[in-house]
Design a protein with these regions (language model features):
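Gly/Ser/Thr-rich phosphate-binding loop
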Residues: 346, 358, 467-471, 481-540, ...
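Conserved ATP/PPi-binding loop(s) of AMP-dependent carboxylate-activating enzymes
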Residues: 543-550, 559-590, 623-625
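A cross-family acyltransferase "interaction/gating" segment
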Residues: 23, 70, 103, 114-180
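AMP-binding/adenylate-forming catalytic core of the ANL superfamily
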Residues: 319, 565, 571, 576-577, ...
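Conserved AMP-binding/adenylation subdomain of ANL enzymes
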Residues: 402-419, 427-469, 483
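AMP-binding/adenylate-forming catalytic domain of the ANL superfamily
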Residues: 228, 346-347, 645, 659, ...
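Conserved pre-ATP/AMP-binding loop-to-beta segment of ANL
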Residues: 230, 343-383, 390, 413-419
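Conserved AMP-binding/adenylate-forming
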Residues: 258-302, 423-425, 624
C-alpha cells in the first residue's frame, strides 16, 4: 500500500510540477548515510517522501507538531525521527541511529527559508559525519522556492512551478574543524566552521545544478523568468520609468527587430554600446543579445583617445547610443567617424517599429533566441580600467555572467524581495552585474542611476526608493556620507564596497552615523567581476571575504615578498579571454587560471586579504616594500582627519636606494614629521618611511572613483625631474 501511494504521489507531482529526480541512484547508498537538502517550502517533505525508499527516516522538529493536527501527523509517524532542537542530547540519539547503519534525511537549515536562499546551516550535520563516519548526500530541491502558498518569503512565486530534485554524493568529507582548546570561544568557532563547511558544499552543489540544468544564455534566462514572474518590476530609473519582465521582452523584441536591419555584419557580431544607467540600457542590451550581437560596452568617461583605441581593438564599426546622451556629455562623434565608426541612435529606432510588429509581440510575448548561441558564446566585451596602461578588452560569456550571479546572490543571501540601488556605470563590471545581470537572472528589483558622482542626490534617492542593497567604492561612499542625513540609509541591509581598499574611517563613519555595516568585497573585470565578499554569515575585518563556491584560489611565490603571494583564481566566472593578443596568450598559458596581479594572503578559513598590486611594490635598498601597506597604515592613523582626506603613496626613482616613497595628499595637516612619527610608531621597517609629503588639491582618479596611480606616478616623476 505504501509503495502504491508513493507511486501515485510521484505521478501527481509529475503532472503538477513536472517533478523529476536526478542522481536517484545516490539514495541506494548503504548506511550510515545522511541526506541533507535545502528547506524552501512546506511541500519539501512531500517531494522527498515520494522520491526516497522506505528505509529512509526524516528528522523532524517536535515543536512544529503544535501548529496544527496536520503538522502533528507529518511530525509523528513511522517514517520520522522527531527531535527537540534545543536539546543537545538529540544529536546523541541521531548518532546512535546512524551507528546502526541508519539513513537519515536532515534539512540543511533549521527552518524554512524566509528569503528563498540557503540560510544558516546546521553545524550538527558535520558533527554526526565525524562521529559516525557517515556518508553525506547533498540534495537540492530546485524550483521549490517559487511554489506559491507554500513558501515563507515575500519574493517571486507562482502556482505550480517546475520542481526537480538533484542528488550528489559529497566526496569531500575531510577538514580539521576540531579546535584544540576547550574554552567557550573556541567551541563557538568550531560550531561556526562546521556550519560554514556544510553551507559551502551546499552552495557549490546548487551552483553546479543551476549551471547544468538552468537556462544557458541571457535570452533564455529572460524568457524563463518572464514565464515565472512577468508582472514583476525589475528596473526603475531616476525618471521613475518602470520595466517589468513583460515590458523587457516586448521592448527587446521590438528594438531588436529594427536593429537587426540597421546593424551591419561585423567581427564576431560585435557592436559598440554607449548608454548611461537608465531603463533603456538593459532593454537595449537584451535586444542586442536576442539578435546574436555582442555588445562592446565603451567607457564614456575614459576620454575620446581611449575610446578610439578600444573601438580599433574590438574592430567595431557601429555604436548603439542615444542622441540626447551624446549631446549631454558633449561626446566627440567626429573623432569616431574619422576612424570609420558609425553612430546608431535609439531615437531613430522607434519610428521604424511597425504597428504589425507591436501587435505580433503583444500576442506572442517571447524573447527571441538567436541561432547558434550557447553558454560559451561571448555575451559582452568590457574594458579594464587602464590603471596600469592601455585598457584590455575582456570577453565574458553568457556562462561567466550567469555563473557569477548564481554565485554572488546566494552567497551574500540577497533575497528576491530586496531592492538594489546601483549608481555604478554599466561599463564597470560591478555596475553591469548589479544593474543588469542580477535583475534579469534573479528578478531582484534595481533602481539604476546614471552617475555615482552626484553626492548630494544619491543619499536622498536611496531613502526615497527604500533600497536595501547598495554597492559602491570607498571614494563614492565617503562622498555620500558627506551630504547624507542619518535616516537616508535606514533601509540598507547590505552595503558592499569594491574596486579599492575599504578604509577604517569609512566603516566607522557609516556605523556611527547610519548604523550600517559596510562590508568589503573583491573582484576584477576578468572574473565577471566578483570573486569574494564578506557577509553577515562569514565576516573577517580587514579581509575581502572568502571566495565564492565553485572558485579555486592559489598563491604563487613572488621573489622578495615573504608574506603572501601572487593570487591566482579559477572558476566558471573566469573570462573567455582578452582581445589583446599578448595578454590573451599569457592567460591561455595558465590553463584556466587567471593571474589577478594582486599580492594576497589566504588564512586557514579561506579569507583573502589583499596586500596590494604586484606593481604597487617598490624595491628600496633591495627590499620589496608594499605601497598599499604604507598607505593603509597612514590612513588608519589619520582617521581623525575625516572622510575628506585624500592620501596616496607612490614611488619615484632614487639614486641612493633605487626607489623612494612619496606621500601625496590634499590635507596640509599631513606633514613630513607626522608621517615619519606614524611609520616609526606603527612598527613598520624604516625603509617604509616616505622621503617627503606633496600637497595636491585633488588626486587624479579613474571613472570608477579609484585613484589613478599611473597618472599620479607620471606627475611625481615629472616633478622629480624638474627638481
Amino acid at each position: 500500500m505504501s509503495l502504491f501511494f508513493r507511486f501515485l504521489l510521484r505521478f501527481l507531482l509529475r503532472v503538477l510540477y513536472g517533478y523529476k529526480v536526478f542522481g536517484g541512484e545516490c539514495q541506494k547508498t548503504e548506511g550510515p548515510v545522511i541526506l541533507t537538502v535545502n528547506h524552501s517550502s512546506w511541500l519539501d517533505g512531500i517531494f522527498l517522501y515520494a522520491s526516497l525508499g522506505t528505509d529512509w527516516k526524516f528528522v523532524t522538529s517536535s515543536p512544529t507538531a503544535k501548529l496544527s493536527w496536520l503538522h502533528k501527523k507529518f511530525v509523528y509517524n513511522k517514517w520520522t525521527v522527531p527531535i527537540e532542537p534545543a536539546s543537545a542530547f538529540e544529536l546523541k540519539r541521531l548518532a546512535e541511529i546512524l551507528s546502526k547503519g541508519g539513513k537519515l534525511v536532515i534539512y540543511a537549515e533549521k527552518t524554512i527559508s524566509t528569503n528563498g536562499e540557503l540560510m544558516k546551516t546546521q553545524a550538527g550535520i558535520h558533527f554526526l559525519i565525524q562521529k559516525t563516519n557517515a556518508k553525506l548526500i547533498l540534495g537540492y530541491l530546485r524550483g521549490a522556492r517559487y511554489i506559491k502558498g507554500a513558501v515563507c518569503h515575500p519574493g517571486n512565486s507562482r502556482w505550480f512551478p517546475r520542481v526537480t530534485l538533484h542528488l550528489k554524493i559529497c566526496k569531500e568529507l575531510t577538514g580539521n574543524l576540531h579546535s584544540p582548546s576547550q574554552n567557550k570561544e573556541s567551541h563557538i568557532m568550531t560550531e561556526n566552521r562546521r556550519a560554514i563547511w556544510l553551507r559551502d558544499r551546499m552552495l557549490a552543489h546548487h551552483l553546479e545544478v543551476n549551471l547544468e540544468y538552468g537556462p544557458q544564455t541571457l535570452p533564455h534566462v529572460a524568457r524563463y523568468m518572464c514565464g515565472l514572474a512577468k508582472k514583476v518590476c525589475i528596473w526603475e530609473d531616476f525618471k521613475y520609468t518602470r520595466i517589468t519582465y513583460r515590458k523587457l521582452i516586448l521592448g527587446a523584441s521590438l528594438i531588436g527587430g529594427v536593429l537587426k536591419k540597421m546593424l551591419k555584419p561585423s567581427e564576431d557580431g560585435r557592436v559598440g554600446f554607449l548608454l548611461p544607467g537608465v531603463a533603456a540600457a538593459p532593454v537595449t542590451l537584451l535586444a542586442l543579445w536576442s539578435i546574436g550581437k555582442v555588445p562592446t560596452i565603451l567607457n564614456f568617461s575614459a576620454g575620446i583617445k581611449t575610446i578610439c583605441d578600444c573601438t580599433r581593438l574590438s574592430k567595431i564599426k557601429q555604436v548603439v547610443t542615444s542622441r540626447s546622451f551624446i549631446e549631454q556629455i558633449h561626446f566627440d562623434v567626429k573623432a569616431l567617424a574619422e576612424i570609420g565608426v558609425e553612430m546608431v541612435y535609439l531615437e531613430d529606432v522607434r519610428p521604424q517599429i511597425s504597428l504589425f510588429a507591436k501587435i505580433k509581440n503583444l500576442i506572442f510575448c517571447k524573447c527571441p533566441i538567436p541561432k547558434g548561441i550557447t553558454a560559451q558564446s561571448t555575451a559582452v566585451i568590457l574594458f579594464t580600467s587602464g590603471s596600469e596602461g592601455m585598457p584590455k578588452g575582456v570577453e565574458l560569456t553568457h556562462r561567466n555572467l550567469i555563473a557569477n550571479c548564481e554565485q554572488a546572490v546566494p552567497f551574500a543571501n540577497v533575497a528576491d524581495s530586496y531592492k538594489i540601488f546601483n549608481a555604478l556605470p554599466i561599463f564597470h563590471g560591478f555596475g553591469l552585474m548589479l544593474g543588469v545581470i542580477i535583475p534579469i537572472v534573479r528578478g531582484i528589483r534595481c533602481f539604476i542611476y546614471p552617475s555615482p558622482l552626484h553626492y548630494k542626490i544619491v543619499p536622498g534617492l536611496v531613502y526615497d526608493t527604500k533600497s536595501t542593497v547598495i554597492a559602491s567604492t570607498n571614494t563614492f561612499l565617503n562622498g555620500y556620507a558627506h551630504y547624507a542625513q542619518p535616516s537616508d540609509f535606514s533601509s540598507i541591509k547590505l552595503s558592499i564596497v569594491g574596486g579599492e581598499k575599504l578604509q577604517p574611517s569609512t566603516i566607522k563613519n557609516y556605523a556611527d552615523r547610519f548604523m550600517t555595516l559596510v562590508e568589503e568585497g573583491y573582484g576584477v573585470t576578468e572574473c565577471s567581476p566578483i570573486i569574494s565578499v564578506n557577509t553577515t554569515y562569514d565576516y573577517k575585518p580587514g579581509s575581502v571575504g572568502r571566495p565564492f563556491p565553485g572558485m579555486q584560489v592559489q598563491l604563487k611565490e613572488v621573489p622578495g615578498i615573504t608574506n603572501g603571494g601572487r593570487l591566482l583564481v579559477k572558476g566558471p566566472n573566469v573570462m573567455k579571454g582578452y582581445l589583446n593578443k599578448e595578454a590573451n596568450d599569457a592567460f591561455k598559458a595558465l590553463n584556466g587560471w587567471y593571474d589577478t596581479g594582486d599580492i594576497a594572503t589566504v588564512d586557514e578559513d579561506g579569507f583573502i586579504t589583499i596586500l596590494g598590486r604586484v606593481k604597487r611594490f617598490a624595491k628600496i635598498s633591495g627590499e620589496m616594500i608594499s605601497l598599499t601597506a604604507v598607505e593603509d597604515t597612514l590612513k588608519e592613523a589619520l582617521i581623525e582627519l575625516g572622510s575628506e582626506l585624500e592620501l596616496a603613496v607612490s614611488s619615484v626613482n632614487c639614486e641612493d636606494r633605487g626607489e623612494a616613497l612619496v606621500v601625496v595628499t590634499n590635507n596640509k595637516q599631513v606633514t613630513d614629521e607626522k608621517v615619519r612619527t606614524i611609520i616609526r610608531e606603527s612598527g613598520l621597517s624604516n625603509l617604509c618611511t616616505p622621503r617627503n609629503v606633496m600637497l595636491m588639491d585633488a588626486l587624479p582618479r579613474l571613472g570608477s572613483g579609484k585613484i589613478d596611480y599611473m597618472t599620479l606616478k607620471k606627475i611625481l616623476e615629472g616633478s622629480s625631474a624638474q627638481n
